[in-house]
Amino acid sequence: MAKDHVGLINLCMKTGLQTDLSLAEIYRYSKAKLVVLYDRHFVCFTPEIFVEIENDTITTHPMKGTIGADVPNAREVLLNDPKEHDEQVAICQWMQQELSAVSDDVKIDKFRYFTKVKTVKGDIWQTSSQISGRLKPEYRRDFGDLFEKMLPVGSISGAPKAESEAIIKDVERCKRGFYSGIFVHFDGKVCRSYVLIRFVGSDENGALHYFSGGGITNQSEAKKEYDELGKKVYLTF
């Protein structure tokens, strides 16, 4: 990372999932901001919005930082963790640059707000930030061009993006496929897109696996990062 001047990179791993449930059954019972089933390929129940576009305003909510809600003073512990703070700063700086390519008057509206996610293993706290801007005229109707400009998602690649992608391709042992892509819904007035995380996939033999990822910085400790990946392997019911 230091050699390539990468301040933040998001690495993922694949965990085998043992369950009697089918993808369709997991889809039926899951609860999240977005729950999507794609044939026999995957089910995703993501808590993370990528960008929302309404009235020519674009908003993004990069999510970084996870802790078990059962940890004593969990919110304070997460807020006071220097690595988690620096990770959120890095992704906010990068997403401000990303939004500046397609919008003006970019600003951070909220820095490190909490959301609680319920899982079968217990609740977890996650921190996100909110960044917004006013769409440039050339992107107010051409959302396809906008997404082409902004993808892949910064929160699941890294900063700087090109250098992070090169490292990811070199070190990750499995192909992500649809994992860490986006799902877009446009109703004619509001365009919402979601990051495809919290993701159960099926291979060609029908075996299920769970993708999870986490942000790595020069302050990361391997054991803590590995444990965080485990916390993100869950169902919501």
Segments predicted by a language model, with ranges:
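Extended alpha-helical targeting/anchoring segments
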Residues: 1-237
